[in-house]
Amino acid sequence: IAELEHGSRAAVFSSGMAACTSAIMAVCKAGSHVICMRDVYQPVTRFLENFCIPKLNMAVTYVSGNDLGEVEDAMKKGASLMILESPATFVFRVVDLKAIADLAHKYGVRTYIDNTCMTPIFQNPLDLGIDIVMHTMSKYIGGHSDLIGGVLVSKDDELMKQIIQEMREWYGGILGPMEGWLAIRGLRTLHARLMQHQSTAMEVAEFLEKNDKVRKVYYTGLKSNPQREIIEKQQRGHTSLMSFVLDASVEQSINFINNLKLFGKGCSWGGFESLALMPLYKSSQEELDFRNVDRQLIRIYCGLEGAENLLEDLEQAFNRL
């Protein structure tokens, strides 16, 4: 994985969150200031809000990541770390990684990114100046929904030495041998699987975009994506995750998901099975406003089933709206 990410060293962990929290604790200390994108993986913000702030007296500034002026203003306050995800959770917004990395180097801020949904096949943040890359190996790297693990990669040997000898050892988030073997197995087919995932997802996204019952589609591969210039600059391909909003109520959107037959219901994507869910329909209005997303947002993951079968399943669910 270090070689695929063009890093000098990698460290594997027992979960993605074990990797994430180890990176944060390696860079930060009590009283540190952290900058975090608003739409990162929800457990990351819960870790910051429920542990780092109350127990370590850390300060956290949330930013969109797209407003470089906002990012620079936050960095001027003396931050230790900026936490990124691009494309980000829920609506797959991308941020200009090189521009942010350049600002971070200017102000002495470390940068960390969750690169899980891109994998090293489609995006290499270290080449753009990002300091630490994390992958949840439970997703595409594992590829079969039978593995929990995480990995950190960096070009900074001293930082990786600290993460391995201190954070991983002290917190005990060490990957088991069976999980390591499963991750190696997954890496052997990663490229082939991603090519199929991407091809299927493109067909599904274009199908959704043309459907008059769909209000909005969020997918980095669509030609209509307003962030296309940034996407083409830093990505070599596209995830098979996407989200969309129906021109319908929350209840109708729930029924739409329940009427799907081939798509399973679940959140831990990355395996062979296509999945659908409404990740935020029980969220507070405050949470929705914070992340700037719709309650009835539907996220789907395109697995390895035939594209024509997935389209047929979506079509029959639309017909029952």
Positions of predicted regions on the chain:
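Conserved C-terminal alpha-helix-loop-beta "cap" of PLP-dependent enzymes
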Residues: V214-I298, C302
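A common structural junction motif
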Residues: Y171, L260-S268, A317-L321
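PLP-dependent enzyme catalytic core of the Aspartate aminotransferase-like
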Residues: E49-N50, D73, K77, R193, ...
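Conserved PLP-enzyme active-site core in the AAT-like
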Residues: R9-K213, Y218
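Acidic-histidine catalytic/liganding microenvironments
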Residues: L4, L208-D212, L260
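Short amphipathic alpha-helical segments
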Residues: S8, I148, A183-G186, H238-M242, ...
